[in-house]
Structures are given as structure tokens and as C-alpha cells.
Amino acid sequence: MKKKGKNRIIIGCKTQLKDINTLFASIFTLTSLDFSHFDTSQVFNMKSLFFDMSTITDLDLSNFKTDNVTDMSLMFKDCSSLINLNLSNFNTNKVIYMKSMFDGCCSLINLNIDNFNTENVISMRSMFSFCSSLKNLNILHFKTNKVNDMRYMFYECSNIENLDLSNFNTENVKNMKCMFSKCLKLINLNIKNFCFNNINNYKDLSVILDISKNQKDSNIGNMFENINENCQIIFGN
């Protein structure tokens, strides 16, 4: 690990690490890291890698090789000052856990994850919770066939205006509690292909909307409470 400047560190490693769980967690003095010499080709665990790095503003991870990674849960959780995040070369083909991956990234305005393959992911719980500066999020390409937990997935994404989840397969999802709660500016939500057959807990699936006129079933009556009253939700036929 080499120092460069007051708040910038160049990361280098002569050995091939396999588990870098919490490697940089809770470091409060850095604003950026240089990973151009960091070999991640053998890594399988990146859980909580940057957890609670509350002063980091820029992360360019375009050099990361993630072909073998299975766990990315809490990877950027509570990186509350993070503004620029480059994940353009991430290979997520083997990733199983994305729980709270971006949870608490409240300064992140743009998030490009168009390259993410989520076909093996089983948990997306709180994946984007408290991403309160995000205005747009393109995840239409997400494959969610294996996902069983989506609770709090977009909780308090308070600036997001449009969410197109029309390609989501939710047949195996068991919990959607508070999935859209406190999405205060959400205008359009497309969930036309959502399946609720295995849901154990509907309460507060919330998009901050009273749909009592359209939904009388007491089991899902609180599904969309407390969001933008003008939000248009597209359901299936």
C-alpha cells in the first residue's frame, strides 16, 4: 500500500488475495483510492469491502476482476460521501448476494450498472436503500428469477422519479416489505409482471400511494402506503 498525497492511497498487492471481506471498512481519512495495481482475479468474497468509508468521494473500480466473486453484499454500504463510482467492468455472473450493496450511498447521483448480470442473485434486500440522491436507475435488464428477498430494496430512494421493473420475475420472492417505502418523488412505477404468489409479508410494500379504491384485499391493503399521491403504478392485467 503506497501513499500518494494527503487523502489518496495507491493500492498494490504482490499476492493474490481470495477473501477481502471488510478490507477497507470504516476507514475515515481517505477521499479516493487508486486500484490500478490491485489484483482481484482470485477474489471470491467482497462483502463489506468499502463498508462505512464515509469520506470516500471517488471509486474507480474499472480495473477490478470480479469473475469469481459470489458475495457483494454491503460492499458500498454507508459510503455516504461517494459521488463517482465506476463499475464498468464488473462481472457479476457468479454473484449470489447483493444485499445492501449500495445501501446508504446517499450522495450518489448516478449509478451505471447496465453491465450487471443478476441471474444467480438470491438476495436484493435493501440493495438501493437510502440512495436518496438517485434520480434515475436503469435495472430493466435485471434477471430476478432466483431472488427470494426484495424487502426495503428501494427504501427511501426519495428523489427517484421513474422505475421500470416490468421485466422482473418475482415468482420466488417471499418478502417485499417496504420495498418502495418513502419513494417520495416516484411518478411512474411499472410492475406489470410482478407475481405475488409466494409473498409472506405484503405490509408496506409502499410506494406512498393509497390504492384502497382498487385493492380491497386485506392481506395487501398496506402494500402501497405513504408515497407520492400522484404516482402512477402499472400492474399486470
For the regions a protein language model found, what residue spans apply to each?
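Negatively charged
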Residues: 1-237
